[in-house]
Design a protein with these regions (language model features):
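A short, N-terminal "cap"/entry segment at the start of jelly-roll beta-barrel domains
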Residues: 1-32
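Short acidic-glycine-tyrosine-enriched beta hairpin
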Residues: 55-75
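Short, surface-exposed beta-edge/turn micro-motifs
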Residues: 17, 38-41, 86-87
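Short, conserved beta-strand element in jelly-roll/cupin
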Residues: 36-51, 55, 92
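Structural motif
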Residues: 48-50, 69, 88
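Short, charged/polar surface micro-motifs in flexible loops or helix N-caps
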Residues: 15-18, 25-28, 46-50, 57, ...
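Double-stranded beta-helix
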Residues: 80-103
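Short histidine-centered beta-strand/loop micro-motifs
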Residues: 29-36, 53-54, 62-63, 82-83
Length: 103
């Protein structure tokens, strides 16, 4: 829903626009998402999480993030996150065309 609202507000800037958001998670994500229009920067600001990336060739990568660490989700890479206790992260996302699928 957040991507739909962003898309409506930022339609004029298209793929050049970025959605900047911060979320706190207390459990692992229940879905995957993918941003075809550009890379996404994920900055962990508190707690820890493991970002799970699925590349187009099917290869999986896990990136452990603690407070102060960051990762980049390249365009077209499906990603989700595992959270053991709690994590807060900032996301800088090329939100146009974002897709979701169940985990």
């Amino acid at each position: 829903a957040c991507y739909d609202a962003y898309g409506a507000r930022a339609a004029a800037v298209g793929a050049e626009g970025r959605l900047v958001s911060q979320y706190t998670f207390s459990e692992s994500w229940i879905s995957w998402e993918m941003h075809p229009a550009g890379a996404e920067v994920v900055i962990c600001v508190a707690g820890s999480m493991v970002l799970v990336q699925e590349f187009p060739d099917g290869q999986l990568a896990e990136v452990a993030l603690a407070a102060g660490d960051y990762a980049i989700n390249p365009p077209g890479v499906w990603h989700t996150a595992d959270v053991a206790e709690s994590a807060t992260a900032i996301f800088i996302t090329a939100g146009e065309g974002t897709e979701h699928r169940p985990r």
